Amino acid sequence: MYFEWDERKNRANLAKHGLSFETAVLVFDDPHAISQPDREVGGEERWQTLGMAHGIAILLVAYTEWEEHGEAAIRIISARKATKRERQKYEEGL
């Protein structure tokens, strides 16, 4: 699996949410992460994943995914710390 993103969007996300996409990708290493479809935008299906990063912060990451050359590819759209309700949802799944 590989990750990509728009660097301008990464900088904007860091300024707005205090979170870089480099950190956001860590949620995909969480064996307890919860992924669900979000919505379709311009014919592109978007997903959200709630997961733990660095074992200390539960994050919500929005992204699209596809397969390229037989490998899963993920484009990060946005990332932020999970809300209280989202954290509860994650913790209930443990």
Protein language model annotation of sequence segments:
Residues 1-94:
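Ribonuclease/tRNase effector modules and their secretory precursors
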